[in-house]
């Protein structure tokens, strides 16, 4: 079993699977420098060369090989996400420690200390954060993200929606969120109460629905979930044409067509948040195969 599972995972076409998340190489570089900074990476590169030539310090080569391999693996499959940058942290830490260990000039130590101070202070300066990776405009000399949490003006509305869903959806039933933007998605609803220190009144019942065409080929959850929370206009976060499954499913529910005919709206749950109309639908029967075929024909035309 393990061998078959391993072969299946290793032979998978990840480039096609995550094609919806693949942008330009420039986007990768802008994200990487946003969190690490050009100066920091450049200083480590120069110090590695100097240590290799003058100190015969070759351990840094292993760290650079590890980071370069990770970089090219991602460039060949998809654009980096913030979480993927953690792959580079161990090597960057070791490069920094080795570089500091070989510092013999006082001015170099002062310079490294000043750079560390600038990095530490700069990430706590309040600034407007991009809503997604494609909004990062340029490469950064020093890290220019903000450690301060993003404040939302619609927090009360999100909490009210979550509480309404908790009291409306029957115990044991599942809820799917047909929205995938940074304004509304399943993770926002799941984490709304914990992130604000509000005690949840029930266990999580939210399940993932298909969101990305190239990645989510199994549409079964969309046909079997007990409740669907639908946001209109369709909430997506990738380039046009990458999330047709979300857009077409929203069209079905808004027009009460094909797969949506298996559901009934729960009108008391309708609300508007930040210009987005949100409706809850309850499945009252199994999906008909004819409706599924009609819906999927729009996806794979």
Regions found by a protein language model. Name each.
Residues 46-49, 160-163, 187-194, 248-253:
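Short, well-ordered amphipathic alpha-helices
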Residues 1-59, 68-78, 122:
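Transmembrane-lumen/periplasm boundary regions of multi-pass, lipid-linked membrane glycan transferases
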Residues 116-182:
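Membrane-embedded, lumen/periplasm-facing catalytic core of multi-pass transferases
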Residues 59-61, 163, 213-217:
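A generic local structural motif
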Residues 38-43, 61-63, 71, 78-105:
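Hydrophobic/aromatic-rich transmembrane helices and adjacent perimembrane loops
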Residues 50-59, 96-114:
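Membrane-interface junctions at the ends of membrane-embedded or membrane-associated helices
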Residues 171-172, 176-224, 234-248:
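Extracytoplasmic
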Residues 223-301:
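Aromatic/acidic, Gly/Pro-rich catalytic loop(s) in extracytoplasmic/lumenal soluble domains
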């Amino acid at each position: 079993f393990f061998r078959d599972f391993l072969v299946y995972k290793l032979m998978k076409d990840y480039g096609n699977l995550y094609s919806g998340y693949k942008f330009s190489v420039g986007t990768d570089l802008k994200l990487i420098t946003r969190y690490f900074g050009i100066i920091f990476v450049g200083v480590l590169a120069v110090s590695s060369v100097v240590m290799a030539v003058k100190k015969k310090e070759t351990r840094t080569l292993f760290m650079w090989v590890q980071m370069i391999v990770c970089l090219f693996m991602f460039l060949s499959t998809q654009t980096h996400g913030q979480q993927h940058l953690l792959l580079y942290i161990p090597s960057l830490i070791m490069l920094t420690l080795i570089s500091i260990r070989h510092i013999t000039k006082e001015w170099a130590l002062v310079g490294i200390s000043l750079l560390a101070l600038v990095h530490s202070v700069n990430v706590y300066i309040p600034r407007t954060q991009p809503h997604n990776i494609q909004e990062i405009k340029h490469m950064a000399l020093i890290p220019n993200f903000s450690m301060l949490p993003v404040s939302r003006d619609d927090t009360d509305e999100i909490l009210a929606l979550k509480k309404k869903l908790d009291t409306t959806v029957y115990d044991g039933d599942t809820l799917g969120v047909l929205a995938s933007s940074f304004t509304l998605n399943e993770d926002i609803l799941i984490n709304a109460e914990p992130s604000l220190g509000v005690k949840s009144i029930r266990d999580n019942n939210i399940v993932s629905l298909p969101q990305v065409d190239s990645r989510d080929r199994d549409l079964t959850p969309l046909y079997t979930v007990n409740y669907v929370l639908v946001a209109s206009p369709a909430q997506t976060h990738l380039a046009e044409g990458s999330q047709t499954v979300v857009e077409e499913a929203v069209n079905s529910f808004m027009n009460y067509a094909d797969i949506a005919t298996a559901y009934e709206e729960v009108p008391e749950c309708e609300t508007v948040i930040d210009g987005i109309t949100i409706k809850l639908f309850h499945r009252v029967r199994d999906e008909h195969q004819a409706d599924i075929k009609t819906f999927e024909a729009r996806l794979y035309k």
